[in-house]
Amino acid sequence: MFLIVGLGNPGKEYEHTRHNVGFDIIDVISEKYNIDLNKKKFKGMYGDGTIANEKVILLKPLTYMNLSGESIKEVTDFYKIPKENVIVIYDDISLEVGRMRIREKGSAGGHNGIKNIIAHFGSDVFPRIKVGVGQPVQRDLVSHVLGKFNKDDREILSKVFEAASDAAENIIEKGTAEAMNKFNGFKA
């Protein structure tokens, strides 16, 4: 069994912001694999289905980004999902828009949502799909990540969201190393 988590913040004011690309990609995966996120439990919205012949849970934590680990840990404890089978999808300001990077493990890199997940797991060994949202230009970091994308970036991101969905399936089917080889050079 796998858990695919998209990080984001709940609430209308955060919809389609840079910080919520994880939620947006979960929506793409949900639609592609016909998995409804219609259950509210574990401090999140979730649904279950099948991807690549594996049982999968999709999760959007509703704890706000910086406490995402609480929701994820509740799901992994309840379903006995090993952290190596938890795929976390989130925004990365160090990558330009149109890029994504897959990692098997690693530090939080300044991302408070990831920092909280590492704290709850007691480990940084879990696969992640980092989606580029670009560096802030003449504005502070908070305004940047809570800001929305312009029209051109949204068009690029629709391709990235599809690729991230394919990458999650590839991780499930063939493993993180294979997905890294296939997708880490991706540019939309």
From Swiss-Prot:
It is an enzyme of class 3 (hydrolase). Its EC number is 3.1.1.29. It comes from the Bacteria. Transmembrane segments: none annotated. GO terms for molecular function: peptidyl-tRNA hydrolase activity; tRNA binding. This is Peptidyl-tRNA hydrolase. NCBIfam families: pth. The lineage of its organism: Bacteria, Bacillati, Bacillota, Clostridia, Eubacteriales. InterPro entries: Pept_tRNA_hydro (IPR001328), Pept_tRNA_hydro_CS (IPR018171), Pept_tRNA_hydro_sf (IPR036416). TRNA binds at Y14, Y64, N66, N112. The record marks N9 as: Discriminates between blocked and unblocked aminoacyl-tRNA. The keyword Cell wall biogenesis/degradation does not apply. It catalyses: an N-acyl-L-alpha-aminoacyl-tRNA + H2O = an N-acyl-L-amino acid + a tRNA + H(+). Monomer. The record marks D91 as: Stabilizes the basic form of H active site to accept a proton. PROSITE patterns: PEPT_TRNA_HYDROL_1, PEPT_TRNA_HYDROL_2. The gene is pth. Keywords: Cytoplasm, Hydrolase, RNA-binding, tRNA-binding. GO terms for cellular component: cytoplasm. Belongs to the PTH family. Its main location: cytoplasm. The active site is at H19.
